[in-house]
UniProtKB/Swiss-Prot annotation:
The keyword Oxidoreductase does not apply. It holds the Pfam family Amidase. HAMAP family: GatA. InterPro entries: Amidase, Amidase_CS, Amidase_dom, AS_sf, GatA. The gene is gatA. GO terms for molecular function: ATP binding; glutaminyl-tRNA synthase (glutamine-hydrolyzing) activity. Keywords: ATP-binding, Ligase, Nucleotide-binding, Protein biosynthesis. It comes from Lactobacillus helveticus (strain DPC 4571). The active site is at 71 (charge relay system), 146 (charge relay system), 170 (acyl-ester intermediate). This is Glutamyl-tRNA(Gln) amidotransferase subunit A.
Amino acid sequence: MNYLNENIDSLNKKLASGDLSADKLAKDTVANIKDTDKKLNAWITVVDDAKPAENLDFSKSKLAGIPIAIKDNIITNGIKTTAASHMLYNYMPMYDATVISKLKKAGATFVGKTNMDEFAMGSSTEHSYYGVTHNPWNLDKVPGGSSGGSAAAVAGGQVVAALGSDTGGSIRQPAAFNGIFGIKPTYGRVSRWGLIAFGSSLDQIGVMTKRVKDSAEVLNVIAGGDEHDSTVSTREVPDFTKFIGQDVKGLRVAVPKEYMEAVSGEMREVIQKQIDALKDAGAIINEVSLPHTKYVVPDYYIIASSEASSNLQRYDGIRYGYRAEDTKSLLDVYVKSRSEGFGAEVKRRIMLGSFALSAGSYDRFFRQAAKVRTLICNDFDKIFAENDVIVGPTTTEPAFDIGSEISDPIKMYNNDILTISANLAGIPAASVPAGLVDGMPVGLQVMAKRFDEGNVFKTADFIERTNKFYEKTPTGMED
């Protein structure tokens, strides 16, 4: 089953009419993954005997019988979950993350776990114990990260929907690189219980699909309160599909000058074309400034790395994770297990975070980063007082060549400069395909105030209906 020309609505109609059985859909999906993943390496684990739930009601749930991919840092009962790390190479969970429980209740079928940067730390899916994932548009390019496997699986037609996680752009950047839609909801909109922690004040589970409406369908299911997660909001979740097909006339759209200045001329033209389409449809375009944009990368990497160093303390060979052999002392167990279990990028961030939290550095680094984070939040509050959404490029460039940036951590970190702010501020943000530059997709980022995913969906859906990018086929998947 190839999903390049399918969506949740089309599959639901076939399942409801009896033209397609959920069992056949699951089997065909697994067969197609095994065939096409020779090119992509988008998966860490494929469930060979994936079976749909029994007594599915296709009229009550659009997700009934729909195969969904899950990023490998989201806990799945009975399906290996590794976070793409040697540290967890044989971890078999005994419970489900809350989002998985909700999807099961909706009747979704789980066909496997997708590749990612180890512990979600990276922007290219090159930092994986299971090898690099390839971009379906050009197999020599990265798919972005850290949710690169989920993005490639959707763009490559292996599934119609996938879950990812976003700590600094890990859904939106790969969505842009692969020409699909990806949304990071408001921090607290979706439960993080069962998400392997990276940066606890930044992490958020989200959705990646080819069509905007499909993400709305999935978010309808996974959003909402959870007694296991004290940071998740209990406010009522609207039907996000109601924002699909809406008029954008009168929508107040802010365009940050710092974002537009960060991209090349050709890429700027593609982004500007989408902004002009909004204007032609009656949206009100306002140029604005996010003056603290230049500080977001160092601010983020201090905060995120500090939280990561704390969260990853538990993986020591005693409490959790890989345990090294031939050790002679308890200290030897700790040192060898962590040295052998973690990859280079994870160790780099643990060291950075441990330094920022150390007694001599806490006030100079972490405390100052927290203050700058407040300034960044204030910038957004000021803009949303007079605007409904913020739009601009998702990334500063299209997907880059595999191996071209992995040896330069600073260059790799700067890939996140346009996406990080939304995580620091906790606001909803999405990337929707805007067009092609040098044959590779680029995305338009849409942001809104906290818990206003509705305007994000409304704006992104308008862009999708205008440019119909979903009709394009990734060139790397052509026979």
